[in-house]
Amino acid sequence: MSKIVKVIGREIIDSRGNPTVEAEVHLEGGFVGLAAAPSGASTGSREALELRDGDKSRFLGKGVTKAVDAVNGPIAQALTCKDAKDQAALDKTMIDLDGTENKSKFGANAILAVSLAAAKAASASKGMPLYEHIAELNGTAGKFSMPLPMMNIINGGEHADNNVDIQEFMIQPVGAKSIKEAVRMGSEVFHNLAKVLKSKGMNTAVGDEGGYAPNLESNAAALAAIKEAVEKAGYMLGKDITLAMDCAASEFFGEATGNYNLKGEGKTFTSQEFTHYLEDLTKQYPIVSIEDGLNESDWDGFAYQTKVLGDKIQLVGDDLFVTNTKILKEGIEKGIANSILIKFNQIGSLTETLAAIKMAKDAGYTTIISHRSGETEDATIADLAVGTAAGQIKTGSMSRSDRVAKYNQLIRIEEALGDRAPFNGLREVKGQA
């Protein structure tokens, strides 16, 4: 019933109007899995390769017909008649057939789409929801939790066309008792933030991830606006709602100078100075998590940042670790950061993603399942977060259907699991239990 009989790839459109790869995996019992690969804007240099055509006459060079051809050709041939329930074997077959260190032959976008579609088909053949199947693959059958959301309500950096350098300013509804309540709280703050920004004559157009993207005089001004919105919504900052930031500092790091350049504020910092700039923000506002607070290659700086802030707040590696167990292992050994952002298209298969989650948890690092700035209606990351009991999820703001699709799936899962999937709130955040 779980033997693969057909694999189909196609080119579809993501939330930024760019092509991406969608895959279908059909099983002999009539079961079908459908999945699409996401795409990032600010990407780590060591991510698995997203294969694009480079043909400027189609989609400005961003077409993915080469990756789709890989799905419909060699990948389909290799996986036909294989057992979809053996996820590790399927992923190994594709990785070995690709034969490159970074999946550059077929593209991580091709391999991942098939990997996820196969998992969905297998879960259907077993008559269970995807999150239950993922828990079994993870070796944690029956162990679930609902993730604390990080909601990106002000977008900057590579995710918006504004003057704000820090890429994401997020709220965490830690006072909620359930994911359903967390979503309501996030929505109320989001709408009150629009009122705050409008009252200041600011733009309320949204960025790639559904957050507002106004021009602001400083990063502190973004935090101040959110504080006002939280209070307008009737909540207490630091008790009901905490704050998180994704600096994506690699995007404003000067390779030639080794400095960090906040153009929006007209300020330049050394590595240690920028750590203390962030430290000052954490003293002014209840910021409990900072992601990519330095350039991905500034490991000495990260060691210093971890020494200064690591026992107080969660320090998340995204571009730093790129969901790669080899890099994460080195980070753990050197005491770099204390948390990892999990993006399965950074590594390119479900099996490798689960390995990164396990390694992080075994080392005492927290795990945050994440979307990308280029998304589709595919809500697999919601099931991944619950099925691995990851603890936290980052999937954008309270607008754009590509973002809310994930929140809506979490609401459905919570309804189905009830008390079997506790919502632990702030206890999931490193340094805040």
Curated annotation (Swiss-Prot):
Active site residues according to the UniProt entry: E209, K343
Any one of the GO CC terms: phosphopyruvate hydratase complex
Keyword Magnesium among UniProt keywords: yes
Cell membrane keyword on record: no
Cofactor(s) required for function per UniProt: Mg(2+)
EC number: 4.2.1.11
Binding site for (2R)-2-phosphoglycerate: Q167, K343, R372, S373, K394
GO terms for biological process, alphabetical: glycolytic process
Keyword list, A-Z: Cytoplasm, Glycolysis, Lyase, Magnesium, Metal-binding, Secreted
SUPFAM superfamilies: Enolase C-terminal domain-like, Enolase N-terminal domain-like
Entry's Gene Ontology molecular function annotations: magnesium ion binding; phosphopyruvate hydratase activity
Annotated metabolic or biological route of this protein: Carbohydrate degradation; glycolysis; pyruvate from D-glyceraldehyde 3-phosphate: step 4/5
Alphabetical list of Gene3D superfamilies matching this protein: Enolase-like C-terminal domain, Enolase-like, N-terminal domain
Regions that span the bilayer: none
Chemical reaction(s) catalysed: (2R)-2-phosphoglycerate = phosphoenolpyruvate + H2O
Binding sites annotated in the UniProt record for Mg(2+): D246, E291, D318
Xref: Pfam families: Enolase_C (PF00113), Enolase_N (PF03952)
Cell location: Cytoplasm; Secreted; Cell surface
Subunit organization: Component of the RNA degradosome, a multiprotein complex involved in RNA processing and mRNA degradation.
Free-text function comment from the UniProt entry: Catalyzes the reversible conversion of 2-phosphoglycerate (2-PG) into phosphoenolpyruvate (PEP). It is essential for the degradation of carbohydrates via glycolysis.
Protein family: Belongs to the enolase family.
Name listed for the protein in its UniProt record: Enolase
Source organism: Sodalis glossinidius (strain morsitans)
